[in-house]
């Protein structure tokens, strides 16, 4: 065993010596090759690839064991015959062609391995080796697979790789020593081995020397020495980010991410499988990171893989990426989403597939948000199955809740699919405003993103490029631009600062909106920093009121920058909480001050100044710090104070003490302060002298001469007042009575009105002075100076009504003060009123308000009580049944409310109260034997008479043939002829229970039917003997109703009340009652009138020549009721019916009453 190991080591050294001496580093295909070992006598290729066996790697792997066994049998070498066998090992391709070059050299120039034939057969000698450099250029990998099945199954095998990375291999003076090689142990499994060689990134371009050493069952195999460059055998990583989408043109775009780690360009191979109506498989090589597949149809599926390799062809193909699946929808939009700006155009294309059938493009319609159909003028046909819609001059998308886009639907003529395309229209007209500071060192630009906030997922940035000098006429976006960092402020604006700046360089800038759908740019704008300067505010601002002139003078100093001519703006106002500003413009660039007129010279003014370029470019500066004026005397007082006097002492004496009183001057009069007051005296004997009283407002002096004139002067730091008031005290003038009367009337507790009359005099009246004081209080006297041309004056003070006041009126002349008019208290009437009721002004309004409230409450209560209790109570004076009754007698009420033994028939309530006009003639008896007939009562309710209009009833047309003995009278009737229809009716009530004879019935029937039969009316058949009963008949007359129309609502529903009353009234053995309706209108419409019978409401024409002119009714005991209530024999009697008209008639005595009913509308 020791000898065997020694022999293997010897072979190692021999191998290294041979390849070093002869420089036999094997230049084979470095990424994939084979290792072959064969006996020396076997030099033909049949050993490596015998006839009948395919020359490929897979065949060699599957049949290597059989090949080796067959080869040994053919050579006749047996284990018993040979104890040692020498093999030649070499590299070759799959056909082993390179091994033949080395088989002839057997004198120490080849690697010989001495093994037993049995071991040779079991281990196998053919290896498939592949080496590559990893894509990250950090690791060199060799992968080995034996061609025999399970070569290391029965032996403990080890594989090592020895390598060296010399910088220069050709100039080595000596062969490389074995110690210079580094060894790595390979990881082996049953079927494969893999060796990892770490290569520094700096040595990827060096030549790598290596060989393999395989040890198994005590036998070692060594491969020839290999030389290769790792950079040329790089195997990239598989591409990542494989994705697919339908392009705007309807093609399928396959794209992936580029490998940023690769230091060299790559080429890609794409293979895809299309499964649609036709299955298609293809593999294409491209240099870009995307591939377009055309003719994409809806409902198709694609399976795609991609791998990469160096573009120059060297290296190894990477592994295939993971397969990616993609399926197109039944309705395809391309593009599915569009992001565009306002005013631009956009187009969508669509392919619609419905139930495995592609819809023709001519059958496709487009909708916007499923609410608005897009006009067909915007449609275009791209192909038989592709429809296109175009939108022009788009407007900004208005967000609707969570939807920030417009949904565009491609629909079939019959239905729409739920899929849609998205249209985002953004207003990119963003205003960028820039401002250069006053020091001209930086420029700040601001802009608002409010118009693009609806675009979710977008980012905005400001991009710009600078021109060396000035701005171009038409700014444009350049592909090469710079990004400016902007910060969002609290006010919602972005702010970007350019520093340093070039004042005369043009900065073209725009806002770029980045989104996953694309990017949009706002219109570019060019800014010249020198044109947007905001200067520093003026400094050293001062303000003062000038002396004597009284003007507000403002001065300032111009800022250092910019050097351009500037204009200035001054604002000023009275100092206070809310300043009312006034402005003044100064356009003189050289001016540093301005004088302004002001109204109040004695007030404090606050002043500020700002500036900007005179040519209008740039911005106004900030306002300067405020400057305030000081209050000081600017002029002499405008006038002296007004003053009055108080006289003390006995008026009979020639000497009296006079106290002068005056009010301090206001600032506007003193301009602006008073240091002291001076009183000047003038008398005839003593001349003129002055008294300085300082700041006091009173002075007492002795009046001893007949005339004494005084003047009060106000003096400030400038001088004494120029205009002053004089007051002359004169004994003769004090007796001049110029005031004739004086009255005082209190208006309220704070106002009293004084009125007076003056008597004519020869003196010149200057003014009047009013004095008043409270006689019960020691507050002192108050006074007012008023003009001389008024005769009443309102005094505003705190007056107590129960106090007593004294009012005095002094006339003041140029010669002196006249005699006053003095009254103690108010006018007498007012005094008594105030004394009786001091709180009159408070009590009276309270009393008036209480009375109004009480009156309103009573009126409301009265109306409610009347509505609840007295609304339905009739007035006896307006009721027909109360006519002629004396309600002063007790028996009237007893008879009125006595219960009758038998029931009577009630008529219906009238629809409205109306006066009655009637014309009735009564005969005392019948001339034939039929006098004894049942009695009846008639109550005629007709229209209200109108004295202005009348009508004559011609009785000849209405005489009855059956009553020849009756003599008719001729009378007049009156009609109101109203425009609206009204209801009139007459009710016949009788308590007779017996049935009249046929003859009696015929008499009445004939009198009625005669008028109806004049024109052969069809109503004649309706009036049979059975249908006409004398017991109770009712005729309803409708006047002034439109021709040929009878209101069914009035005819039926209105009379249902009558029928209800008759039907519900308890009466034994009472026969059926009949109700008949008569239509009455004007004479010129009579031929069109209608009659409504009691049979099924049939409408029949009414006779034009007669209106039931003769109706005879028997009556006896109720004649007094007719006479009293109807005033027989009279005409024009009016009454207002309120209750149903009825009366019960006895059967003991009867009278014949002939009632002439005339047409009231003739």
Curated annotation (Swiss-Prot):
Organism: Rattus norvegicus (Rat)
Function, in words: Receptor for hormone LEP/leptin. On ligand binding, mediates LEP central and peripheral effects through the activation of different signaling pathways such as JAK2/STAT3 and MAPK cascade/FOS. In the hypothalamus, LEP acts as an appetite-regulating factor that induces a decrease in food intake and an increase in energy consumption by inducing anorexinogenic factors and suppressing orexigenic neuropeptides, also regulates bone mass and secretion of hypothalamo-pituitary-adrenal hormones.
Modified residue annotations for Phosphoserine: 880
PANTHER family (alphabetical): CYTOKINE RECEPTOR, LEPTIN RECEPTOR
Keyword Secreted: yes
Quaternary organization: Present as a mixture of monomers and dimers. The phosphorylated receptor binds a number of SH2 domain-containing proteins such as JAK2, STAT3, PTPN11, and SOCS3. Interaction with SOCS3 inhibits JAK/STAT signaling and MAPK cascade.
Membrane-traversing stretches: 840-860
Protein name: Leptin receptor
GO biological process: angiogenesis; bone growth; cell surface receptor signaling pathway via STAT; cellular response to acetate; cellular response to butyrate; cholesterol metabolic process; cytokine-mediated signaling pathway; eating behavior
Motif (Box 1 motif): 869-877
Cytoplasmic side: 861-1162
Residue list for modification Phosphotyrosine: 985, 1077, 1138
């Amino acid at each position: 065993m020791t000898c065997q190991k020694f022999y293997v080591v010897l072979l190692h050294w021999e191998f290294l010596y041979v390849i070093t001496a002869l420089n036999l580093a094997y230049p084979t295909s470095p990424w994939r090759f084979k290792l072959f070992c064969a006996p020396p006598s076997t030099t033909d290729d049949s050993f490596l690839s015998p006839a009948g066996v395919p020359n490929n790697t897979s065949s060699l792997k599957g049949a290597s064991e059989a090949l080796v066994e067959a080869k040994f049998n053919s050579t006749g070498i047996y284990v018993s015959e040979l104890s040692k066998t020498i093999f030649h090992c070499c590299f070759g391709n799959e056909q082993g062609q390179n091994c033949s070059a080395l088989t002839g050299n057997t004198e120490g120039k080849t690697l010989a391995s001495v093994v037993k034939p049995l071991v040779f057969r079991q281990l196998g000698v053919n290896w498939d080796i592949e080496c590559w450099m990893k894509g990250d250029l950090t690791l060199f990998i060799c992968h080995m697979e034996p061609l025999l099945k399970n070569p290391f199954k029965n032996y403990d095998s080890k594989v090592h790789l020895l390598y060296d990375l010399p910088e220069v291999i050709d100039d080595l003076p000596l062969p490389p020593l074995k110690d210079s090689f580094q060894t790595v142990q390979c990881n082996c499994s049953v079927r494969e081995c893999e060796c990892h060689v770490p290569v520094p990134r700096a040595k990827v371009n060096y030549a790598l020397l290596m060989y393999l050493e395989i040890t198994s069952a005590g036998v070692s195999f060594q491969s020839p020495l290999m030389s290769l460059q790792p950079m040329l055998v790089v195997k990239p990583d598989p591409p990542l980010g494989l994705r697919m989408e339908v392009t705007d043109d309807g093609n399928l775009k396959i794209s992936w991410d580029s490998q940023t780690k690769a230091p060299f360009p790559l080429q890609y191979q794409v293979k895809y499988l299309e499964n649609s109506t036709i299955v298609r498989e293809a593999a294409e090589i491209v240099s870009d990171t995307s591939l377009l597949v055309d003719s994409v149809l809806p409902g198709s599926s694609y399976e795609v893989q991609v791998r990469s390799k160096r573009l120059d062809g060297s290296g190894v193909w990477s592994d295939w990426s993971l397969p990616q699946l993609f399926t197109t929808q039944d309705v395809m939009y391309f593009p599915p989403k569009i992001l565009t700006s306002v005013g631009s155009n956009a187009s969508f294309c669509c392919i619609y597939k419905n139930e495995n059938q592609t819809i023709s493009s001519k059958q496709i319609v487009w909708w916007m948000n499923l609410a608005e159909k897009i006009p067909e003028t915007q449609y275009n046909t791209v192909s038989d199955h592709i429809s296109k819609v175009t939108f022009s001059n788009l407007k900004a998308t208005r967000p609707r809740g969570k939807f920030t886009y417009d949904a565009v639907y491609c629909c079939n003529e019959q239905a729409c699919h739920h899929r849609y395309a998205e249209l985002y229209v953004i207003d990119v007209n963003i205003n960028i405003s820039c401002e250069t500071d006053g020091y001209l060192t930086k420029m700040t630009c601001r802009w608002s993103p409010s118009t693009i906030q609806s675009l979710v997922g977008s980012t905005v940035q400001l991009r710009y490029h600078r021109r060396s000098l000035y701005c171009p006429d038409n700014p444009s976006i350049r592909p090469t631009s710079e990004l400016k960092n902007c910060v969002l402020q609290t006010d919602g604006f972005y702010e970007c600062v350019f520093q340093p700046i070039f004042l005369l360089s043009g900065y073209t800038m725009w806002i770029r909106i980045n989104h996953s759908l694309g990017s949009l740019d706002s219109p570019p704008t060019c800014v010249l920093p020198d044109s947007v300067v905001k200067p520093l505010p003026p400094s050293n601002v001062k303000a003062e009121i000038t002396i004597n002139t009284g003007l507000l003078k403002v001065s300032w100093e111009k800022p250092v920058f910019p050097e351009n001519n500037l204009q200035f703006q001054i604002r000023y106002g009275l100092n206070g909480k809310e300043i009312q500003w006034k402005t003044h413009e100064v356009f003189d660039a050289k001016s540093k001050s301005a004088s302004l007129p002001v109204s109040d010279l004695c007030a404090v003014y606050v002043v500020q100044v700002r500036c900007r370029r005179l040519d209008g470019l740039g911005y106004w500066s900030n306002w300067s710090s405020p400057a305030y004026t000081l209050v000081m005397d600017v002029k002499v007082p405008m006038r002296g104070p007004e003053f009055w006097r108080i006289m003390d002492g006995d008026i009979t004496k020639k000497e009296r003490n006079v106290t002068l009183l005056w009010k301090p001057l206001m600032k506007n009069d003193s301009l602006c302060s008073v240091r002291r007051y001076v009183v000047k005296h003038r008398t005839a004997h003593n001349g003129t002298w002055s008294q300085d009283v300082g700041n006091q407002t009173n002075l007492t002096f002795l009046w001893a001469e007949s005339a004494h004139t005084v003047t009060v002067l106000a003096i400030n730091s400038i001088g004494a007042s120029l205009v002053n008031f004089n007051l002359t005290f004169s004994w003769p003038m004090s007796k001049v009575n110029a005031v004739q009367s004086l009255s005082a009337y209190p208006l309220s507790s704070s106002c009293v009105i004084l009125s007076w009359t003056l008597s004519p005099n020869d003196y010149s009246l200057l003014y009047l002075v009013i004095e008043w004081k409270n006689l019960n209080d020691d507050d002192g006297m108050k006074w007012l100076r008023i003009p001389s041309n008024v005769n009443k004056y309102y005094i505003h003070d705190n007056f107590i009504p129960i106090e007593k006041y004294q009012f005095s009126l002094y006339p003041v002349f140029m010669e002196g003060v006249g005699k006053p008019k003095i009254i103690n208290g108010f006018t007498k009437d007012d005094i008594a009123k105030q004394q009786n009721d001091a709180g009159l002004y408070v009590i009276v309004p309270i009393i008036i308000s209480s009375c109004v409230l009480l009156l309103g409450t009573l009126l409301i209560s009265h109306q409610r009580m009347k509505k609840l209790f007295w609304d339905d109570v009739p007035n006896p004076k307006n009721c027909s049944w109360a006519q002629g009754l004396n309600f002063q007698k007790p028996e009237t009420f007893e008879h009125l409310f006595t219960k009758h033994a038998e029931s009577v028939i009630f008529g219906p309530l009238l629809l409205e109260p109306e006066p009655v006009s009637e014309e009735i003639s009564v005969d005392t008896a019948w001339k034939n034997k039929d006098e004894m007939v049942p009695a009846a009562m008639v109550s005629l309710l007709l229209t209200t008479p109108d004295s202005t209009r009348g009508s004559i009833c011609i009785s000849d047309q209405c005489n009855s043939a059956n009553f020849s003995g009756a003599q008719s009278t001729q009378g007049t009737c009156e009609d109101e002829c109203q425009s609206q229809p009204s209801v009139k009716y007459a009710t016949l009530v009788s308590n007779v229970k017996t049935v009249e004879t046929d003859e009696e019935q015929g008499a009445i029937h004939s009198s009625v039917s005669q008028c109806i039969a004049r024109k052969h009316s069809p109503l004649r058949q309706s009036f049979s003997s059975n249908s006409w009963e004398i017991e109770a008949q009712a005729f309803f007359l409708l006047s002034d109703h439109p021709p040929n129309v009878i209101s069914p609502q009035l005819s039926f529903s209105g009379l249902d009340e009558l029928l209800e009353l008759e039907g519900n009234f308890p009466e034994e053995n009472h026969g059926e009652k009949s109700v008949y309706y008569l239509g009455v209108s004007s004479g010129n419409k009579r031929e069109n009138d209608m009659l409504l019978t009691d049979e099924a409401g049939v409408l029949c024409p009414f006779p034009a020549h007669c209106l039931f002119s003769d109706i005879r009714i028997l009556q006896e005991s109720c004649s007094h009721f007719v006479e009293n209530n109807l005033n027989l024999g009279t005409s024009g009697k009016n009454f207002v019916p309120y209750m149903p008209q009825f009366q019960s008639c006895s059967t003991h005595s009867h009278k014949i009453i002939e009632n002439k009913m005339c047409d009231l509308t003739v």
